[in-house]
Amino acid sequence: MYGIEYTTVLTFLISIILLNYILKSVTSAMDFIIYRFLLIIVVVSPFVKTQNYGINVPITGSMDTAYTNSSQQETFLTSTLCLYYPIEASTQIGDTEWKGTLSQLFLTKGWPTGSVYFKEYTDIASFSIDPQFYCDYNVVLVKYNSTLELDMSELADLILNEWLCNPMDIALYYYQQTNEANKWISMGQSCTIKVCPLNTQTLGIGCTTTNTATFEEVATNEKLVITDVVDGVNHKLDVTTNTCTIRNCRKLGPRENVAKLQVGGSEVLDITADPTTTPQTERMMQINWKKWWQVFYTVVDYINQIVQVMSKRSRSFNSAAFYYRI
């Protein structure tokens, strides 16, 4: 009897010892695997270029971050300035060294050599299709033209504000604008926009949905169109999609690192009629028309005052970003 009990106890002890050994072996193996895995991650991570998404961080539209205005009581040692001008300016000046001259003049106002970039554009229409703002501060010179007032106004609305945009499939869906901040923005070589408002039965109001000739034409052969229709009403659209793209956009607020200087004209164009547009005449300024050398001299003289009403930003803006966020 005692032999059986001793055997049982001995078997139990041996089982415990064996189990403990197995657990230690497994633990050691797991530690080896984990440490080796972590070592591989540490070694490989510098060479892997992937996006860190964080933990469910919501994206609310604009990813721009406003910095404290650096123009208050210091020189612009860490800031960049882009000056956009029409090609006619360089043509009239006719001096291959004029940019270097202006850079030296900007230096006298606290802008180090190499911090000011000169960006040339052909005309308002082409600039509207592909605006690119890569500097901390961006100043756009636009010469007034009475025949281009609409283009100038829409360009100002586009570049002086941030927009959140999504693609539109006008072949499959009807669209409506929910409020005054909601606009349809079209860009392209030639944009002709026609709309047909619909009633609750999706029948055309004053138009026939199957006949685009009966649609209301709101833009003809333009390169930039910001379309505003009656809110809360579905619309069938007809757009020259082979030469134009259209996006459903929402105005988020002012883009404060961009200013527009109108050269000439009796008064600066006003885009504040839209109730969603924060009064921004501070970033829409006017210079009386003179020779282009005189215009640039004026810009140099007042550049620090101009920058005072702007805010430095950390991200660039180009036309690709426009389609989803500007």
UniProtKB/Swiss-Prot annotation:
InterPro entries: VP7 (IPR001963), VP7_1 (IPR042207), VP7_2 (IPR042210). It holds the Pfam family VP7. It is found in: Virion; Host endoplasmic reticulum lumen. Glycans are attached at residues 69, 145. Residues 165-167 are annotated as: CNP motif. GO terms for cellular component: host cell endoplasmic reticulum lumen; T=13 icosahedral viral capsid; viral outer capsid. Residues 1-50 form the signal peptide. Ca(2+) 2 binds at residues 177, 228-229, 231, 301. One of its GO terms (molecular function) is metal ion binding. Disulfide bonds join 82-135, 165-249, 191-244, 196-207. Ca(2+) 1 binds at residues 95, 206, 214, 216. It comes from the Viruses. Transmembrane segments: none annotated. Residues 237-239 are annotated as: LVD motif. N-glycosylated. The N-terminus is blocked possibly by pyroglutamic acid. Gene3D superfamilies: Glycoprotein VP7, domain 1 (3.40.50.11130), Rotavirus outer-layer protein VP7, domain 2 (2.60.120.800). Keywords: Calcium, Capsid protein, Disulfide bond, Glycoprotein, Host endoplasmic reticulum, Host-virus interaction, Metal-binding, Outer capsid protein, Signal, T=13 icosahedral capsid protein, Virion. Belongs to the rotavirus VP7 family. HAMAP family: Rota_VP7, Rota_VP7_A. Some rotavirus strains are neuraminidase-sensitive and require sialic acid to attach to the cell surface. Some rotavirus strains are integrin-dependent. Some rotavirus strains depend on ganglioside for their entry into the host cell. Hsp70 also seems to be involved in the entry of some strains. In group A rotaviruses, VP7 defines the G serotype. Calcium-binding protein that interacts with rotavirus cell receptors once the initial attachment by VP4 has been achieved. Rotavirus attachment and entry into the host cell probably involves multiple sequential contacts between the outer capsid proteins VP4 and VP7, and the cell receptors. Following entry into the host cell, low intracellular or intravesicular Ca(2+) concentration probably causes the calcium-stabilized VP7 trimers to dissociate from the virion. This step is probably necessary for the membrane-disrupting entry step and the release of VP4, which is locked onto the virion by VP7. Homotrimer; disulfide-linked. 2 Ca(2+) ions bound at each subunit interface in the trimer hold the trimer together. Interacts with the intermediate capsid protein VP6. Interacts with the outer capsid protein VP5*. This is Outer capsid glycoprotein VP7.
